[in-house]
Amino acid sequence: MWVVGLIGVAVVTILITQYVYKWRNPKTVGVLPPGSMGLPLIGETLQLLSRNPSLDLHPFIKSRIQRYGQIFATNIVGRPIIVTADPQLNNYLFQQEGRAVELWYLDSFQKLFNLEGANRPNAVGHIHKYVRSVYLSLFGVESLKTKLLADIEKTVRKNLIGGTTKGTFDAKHASANMVAVFAAKYLFGHDYEKSKEDVGSIIDNFVQGLLAFPLNVPGTKFHKCMKDKKRLESMITNKLKERIADPNSGQGDFLDQAVKDLNSEFFITETFIVSVTMGALFATVESVSTAIGLAFKFFAEHPWVLDDLKAEHEAVLSKREDRNSPLTWDEYRSMTHTMHFINEVVRLGNVFPGILRKALKDIPYNGYTIPSGWTIMIVTSTLAMNPEIFKDPLAFNPKRWRDIDPETQTKNFMPFGGGTRQCAGAELAKAFFATFLHVLISEYSWKKVKGGSVARTPMLSFEDGIFIEVTKKNK
């Protein structure tokens, strides 16, 4: 009997060994870039999710670039991935959207925003073009000039004056609420004064589960994330159904246009509208609120940066007939030092570890092959940490941007993506951040009370918040 048992153990051992071998050596056409597939089922997910208390490139990426080179293979949450920090390959991939690559998401993102099956926006269709055109019509330069800039300023003023009565508060969380209220208004007509839901808090909770292992069981970050996702989904769905029932009750937001196109575009469904609205809301809130939180961190650590900013914003006010008049588009565009400050914050504070694409066909490059169907993580933040372009790259120094010409900046600074997929909300994000700085620096004093420690896990976050006190200046 023991012989049968021994044979059984041997067979199981052989099968496991074969499985592990196949996992670590996936069958592909051509030669894979060097790398490791990690452990069966989970790959190298745990290494990617490890905490790094620094603004530097996450060690998962940095150490593998040092070991394997700028292109390497890995496996995250069970999905084989090619990671590229090679500038030439990255540029090629951005230019090949719709031909060699398309938009792609990790399982967590797909489940959060329903980006699976017919709802997954891919480059071979015109879904992204549609969403981009609608988003630009709402949040692009023309809308900012004619309407949004003034509304952004009103939103900022209301929140800052409210901050003076709060005592000590978390700037990152408060900023997330501020941006969420603004974005939700223009995306789905959300009225925060009448709603009991805290949109900013829901978005904050999203962040905790986005790159978690997609295990939807109670007690996990991803489970909590999915619960909050359902809350937000319900809010948007209710608004959408109200708008469909009464199309004439429009508010000039994204839902208005989507409802009009509901029966004219084959891919537009109610589920699609809700998914796109949620994705746009998340991207807007997280990028702007993180940047504002980092601004307070850098103000506390490098107070000298305020000298140029204070002088610039005082110059804007002194040229007005009425110092209390609203910020104009020309004034906003004249803020050179402010833009240098914003660039430096965004350079160091890239929220996401990389931009995801999917290979539509085998892609040969430098003797390697990126297999069809594999996910590609395009890491552009290595450019922002290149000491040949940005001297002492981990140092916060907005003045460095005075000497960087436009061509060098375009090639080495891609905070909003590249190719045809550059973020349609880039102008909105910059305008919101700049307007916030204008009102803050011109009219308020502040001090950091506690917090400010950051970490990449691998998304950038504040470990203990960034708590501040704000007071109105005496005129």
From Swiss-Prot:
Name the top EC class: oxidoreductase
Enzyme nomenclature, EC number: 1.14.14.171
**Where located?**
Membrane
The residues the record assigns to binding heme are C423
Check the record and name the Pfam families matching this protein. p450
Query: What is its membrane topology?
Result: Single-pass membrane protein
Transmembrane segments in this chain: where? 3-23
| Record carries keyword Membrane | yes
The record's Gene Ontology cellular component field reads: membrane
InterPro entries the UniProt entry points to: Cyt_P450, Cyt_P450_CS, Cyt_P450_E_grp-I, Cyt_P450_sf
Which cofactors is this protein said to need? heme
Spell out the molecular function terms from Gene Ontology: heme binding; iron ion binding; monooxygenase activity; oxidoreductase activity, acting on paired donors, with incorporation or reduction of molecular oxygen
| Matching PROSITE patterns | CYTOCHROME_P450
Q: Which Gene3D superfamilies match?
A: Cytochrome P450
GO biological process terms, alphabetically, are: brassinosteroid biosynthetic process; brassinosteroid homeostasis; sterol metabolic process
> What chemistry does it catalyse, as a reaction equation?
beta-amyrin + reduced [NADPH--hemoprotein reductase] + O2 = 16alpha-hydroxy-beta-amyrin + oxidized [NADPH--hemoprotein reductase] + H2O + H(+)
**What keywords sit in the KW lines?**
Heme, Iron, Membrane, Metal-binding, Monooxygenase, Oxidoreductase, Transmembrane, Transmembrane helix
Where on the tree of life does the source sit, at the highest rank?
Eukaryota
Q: What does this protein do?
A: Involved in the biosynthetic pathway of maesasaponins, which are oleanane-type saponins with diverse biological activities. Catalyzes the C-16alpha oxidation of beta-amyrin to form 16alpha-hydroxy-beta-amyrin.
Similarity-based family: Belongs to the cytochrome P450 family.
Q: What is this protein called?
A: Beta-amyrin 16-alpha-hydroxylase CYP87D16
The species this protein belongs to is Maesa lanceolata
Species lineage: Eukaryota, Viridiplantae, Streptophyta, Embryophyta, Tracheophyta
